[in-house]
A protein has these predicted regions:
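Core catalytic lobe of class I
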Residues: 1-266, 274
Length: 275
């Protein structure tokens, strides 16, 4: 799981950093190269969770090909479709919705409050623990199950897995009946941002990393983050009994991440041979 640097937003002060390119295609290219290497080392049944946000073209940008000033660039989908051409299976586009987004001064469009999380895999068969991230069903759904479905209506046949009123009201005749209180995780996740007292001001919330890791990585599995930042993914991975490998260009963030992960795991050897 990873979240690469935003495009044309921040300067991390490092040579060969990603995010300060002069054109969207020049930003996408290095990311694709990184993720092709990730694909090479990923298990055949592994998953890749990619968090990326879009941005708008500005007059201060130079050499932007095909982007007019004030135009939404479409970077997430440009990257996702390019990765699909490289052989990745694009399995899901998850919307990370934030109720506490960064305020914006624009008065001629809605304010942004979401980012994309793409689920990509190496094949059509892969590890995905749907029960680990299942959601409780809504109260209204439980009530509908209680009353079942009426006869002689367009809903008489119900939906797969739905029980009839007779099954619920007469369990002795129809056999044991149980209502599953959980439903499959949906693709809009409402998770607020959480401030972190550290040097990295673009850290995503631990709950976001937790959901992806629980669903896509088995216990004792390895989580790889090629853009480690302040170590949110690493801290969550260690807390969930997963192994972790983090890669970071900025030494300051590396030290911050090491300290953060050590607090969770208590392992003093963390950071030895840090990439």
């Amino acid at each position: 799981m990873t979240s690469p640097p935003y495009y044309a937003l921040r300067d991390y002060g490092k040579e060969n950093q990603i995010g300060r390119e002069g054109a969207p295609e020049e930003y996408i290219g290095p990311l694709v190269s990184v993720f092709c290497e990730l694909k090479r080392v990923l298990r055949s049944d592994g998953t890749f969770w990619l968090n990326i946000a879009d941005c708008y073209s500005r007059k201060s940008y130079h050499g932007l090909s095909g982007c007019k000033p004030k135009e939404l660039m479409g970077l997430p989908w440009l990257l996702a479709l390019t990765l699909r051409k490289e052989g990745w299976f694009l399995r899901s586009d998850i919307i990370w919705q934030k109720d506490n987004p960064m305020p914006e001064s624009a008065k001629d469009r809605p304010s942004r409050c979401y980012e994309h999380i793409f689920l990509l895999t190496k094949s059509g068969k892969y590890f995905y623990d749907n029960l680990a991230v299942a959601e409780p069903i809504a109260l209204s759904t439980a009530i509908r199950y209680r009353y079942g479905r009426k006869e002689n209506t367009k809903y008489a046949d119900g939906i797969p897995g739905q029980m009839s009123r007779q099954q619920i009201n007469n369990p002795c005749r129809y056999g044991k009946t149980e209502i599953n209180p959980l439903r499959n995780k949906r693709d809009v996740w409402n998770i607020n941002t959480v401030p972190y007292k550290g040097a990295h001001f673009a850290a995503f919330p631990p709950r976001l990393a937790e959901t992806c890791i629980l669903a896509g990585c088995p216990k004792q599995g390895i989580v790889l983050d090629p853009f480690m930042g302040s170590g949110t993914t690493g801290a969550v991975a260690k807390g969930l009994n997963r192994q972790y490998i983090g890669i970071e260009l900025n030494e300051e963030y590396c030290r911050l991440a090491e300290e953060r992960i050590k607090k969770v795991s208590g392992d003093k050897k963390i950071g030895e041979g840090c990439v």
